Amino acid sequence: MKALVGFRKKNKKDLYTELLQLLREQFNLRMQSVSGKLKQPHLLRKVRRNIAQVKTLLDSKEEIK
């Protein structure tokens, strides 16, 4: 919930950079998961939810304009 509040304060450009960072992080976590080195599997779910939240906010900001 804290992340969503922080995402709402950002502008469109910052949301895109945040989305790219989250996608990279998701990729890295997936690679760690496949190789068996992932110590905290809950992070996959957390990152996936954050990606969905950022995408939803980007869509809503585009509808407003």
Curated annotation (Swiss-Prot):
SUPFAM superfamilies: Ribosomal protein L29 (L29p)
Entry-linked Pfam families: Ribosomal_L29
Swiss-Prot/TrEMBL keywords: Ribonucleoprotein, Ribosomal protein
Annotated Gene Ontology cellular component terms: ribonucleoprotein complex; ribosome
GO process terms (BP): translation
InterPro entries listed in its UniProt record: Ribosomal_uL29 (IPR001854), Ribosomal_uL29_CS (IPR018254), Ribosomal_uL29_sf (IPR036049)
Molecular function via GO: structural constituent of ribosome
Family: Belongs to the universal ribosomal protein uL29 family.
Protein name: Large ribosomal subunit protein uL29
